[in-house]
Amino acid sequence: MDMAQEPVTFRDVAIYFSREEWACLEPSQRALYRDVMLDNFSSVAALGFCSPRPDLVSRLEQWEEPWVEDRERPEFQAVQRGPRPGARKSADPKRPCDHPAWAHKKTHVRRERAREGSSFRKGFRLDTDDGQLPRAAPERTDAKPTAFPCQVLTQRCGRRPGRRERRKQRAVELSFICGTCGKALSCHSRLLAHQTVHTGTKAFECPECGQTFRWASNLQRHQKNHTREKPFCCEACGQAFSLKDRLAQHRKVHTEHRPYSCGDCGKAFKQKSNLLRHQLVHTGERPFYCADCGKAFRTKENLSHHQRVHSGEKPYTCAECGKSFRWPKGFSIHRRLHLTKRFYECGHCGKGFRHLGFFTRHQRTHRHGEV
């Protein structure tokens, strides 16, 4: 029987997409698909092969998403019903598309079909100028592909890079790198926000109490303390708290014996020396002067730390590499370098880096012939 002379329905010439395939299409391709499918339905109806309006056409006319489940697709239902009367049976009882590896390869065909928007209009529009209605079958996804980059079923082929990988790649391309620590950021605003960690800038101030914060999210979290209900009240001073454990922590101020109280702000101290050091904050007095540069300091400890700048003393020495530091903070940061794994290793000289920005900057020295 000549297949070209069979009565053709819209179901024979329609294209059906699954949810995953529909998500791969561009908006322009979706609009093209809608126009082509509605034109094909009009052509079928105009030639007298009219049938009840398909659900796919109704969805397209109402601008709804036309994807269907796999069990609703014609090729799936054809397998469930068996071959049509008079159709040729395959010599191989097991279809190759039923193999798991073949089903895996079909994902490549779907992606290629989604990228070729013109294939909709070229392969699936019905031509009725000569009065004949050809059977325009959609491109079969179970047709044997020519080549695939992956041959192993367990391989994670075609995996799109994750959000973190794309962000790092974009940071390297745009060179949003912190000059202090070498960390790479995805945009200029993130770089500016990150640099406040090094500068100590706190640009967000609470209008209620004046407390400053480095991040806007911390300010918003803090402002809830002013608006939320505070049912736990201190019997000694009347200060209220939103949490019971905060009240218990506050009560220690009243129970601990602090005989030395500041006359300016009321803050109490256990030792008189601590009170005298605190009062310098109110008076602004700096009694300790550097003999080399004349700079004044509030405490003797701060003066001794400053004098290391002139003497060159570096009392903090790393036991791993022997590097010395003047300040304990810099020494503690350096020790983390030995404890933290260095993820980025240079293939030319073997030098390791913790941050992608420093690693990228180092590789440029090899390209420019500086190393």
Swiss-Prot record:
Name the record gives this protein: Zinc finger protein 707
Family: Belongs to the krueppel C2H2-type zinc-finger protein family.
Function, in words: May be involved in transcriptional regulation.
Domain KRAB: 8-79
Cross-referenced PROSITE patterns: KRAB, ZINC_FINGER_C2H2_1, ZINC_FINGER_C2H2_2
Organism: Homo sapiens (Human)
PANTHER family the UniProt entry points to: ZINC FINGER PROTEIN, ZINC FINGER PROTEIN 707
GO MF annotations, alphabetized: DNA-binding transcription factor activity; RNA polymerase II cis-regulatory region sequence-specific DNA binding; zinc ion binding
Gene Ontology terms: cellular component: nucleus
Superkingdom of source: Eukaryota
